[in-house]
Amino acid sequence: VSAGVLIAVLAGCSTGEPGEAQPVPSTGSTTSESVKPTTSKPARPKELKVDGIDPCATFTAAQRSELKINETSTKPLDVLTNDKPVPTCRNRADGDTMSSYNVSLISGVGIDHWEGGSNLDVVAKTVAGFAAYQYKLAGTSEAYCSYAVDVADKQQLVVQFFPIGDGFTQDQMCQNAAKGAELALATLQTLK
C-alpha cells in the first residue's frame, strides 16, 4: 500500500527540465541513534496535541519559501496503510527539481505504530528533542523518506519527502524529510 501512496503522489508529475538536486540545509537538530525501534524513546520536551489543527498550517509562509513550496492542497492520505486516511497537506516544491513535502497530523495512533514488522526500513531518530522514526520502503533508495515524530500520547506528526522525478539521493530525501519535520515542529509549538 505504501507503493500505492507513492504512485498516487507521483501520478501525472514530471519535471520536464533537468537540474541539480539540492538538499535543504540542516540546522543540526536532528540526531540518529543506532538502536532498534523497540528501544525506549526519550521523553518529549513538551506535549503538542494535533487534534483539530490544519496540516497546511504547519509551515509558515517563511518556511514554505525556505523549502521552495509554491503549492499546497489538503487531501486525506492513508499514511499508516491501515485504510484510515488522515488529514494531510501536500506541499509541492518547485526548486531545481520538483518534490513534495506531505505533512500528516495523526491522532489515535502513536509512533509505536512504526515498530512492528513491515516492508519498511525504520531507524530511531530525534528531531528537536522529540523521539522520531525515520522510515523508507525497504530495498529501495529512490522512492521517498519519512519522519514520524512523537508529539503527544497516541499522536504523531508525519512528514514525507517525495521526489517528483529524478535528482535526489536517499540521504538528501531523508535530510529534507528531517528538515520538514523540524520546521513543522517549530510551527506546531506556536499553534493552539
Give, region by region, the residue ranges found by the protein language model:
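Amphipathic alpha-helical segments
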Residues: 54-72
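A short, solvent-exposed beta-edge/loop patch
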Residues: 44, 120-192
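Short, solvent-exposed recognition patches
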Residues: 66, 70-134
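N-terminal low-complexity, Pro/Thr/Ser-rich intrinsically disordered segments
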Residues: 28-55
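Short, low-complexity, disordered segments immediately C-terminal to signal peptides
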Residues: 1-6, 11-37
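Extracellular/mature segments of secreted proteins
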Residues: 21, 62-67, 96-100, 153, ...
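Sequence contexts marking disulfide-bonded cysteines in secreted/extracellular proteins
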Residues: 14, 55-57, 88-90, 144-146, ...
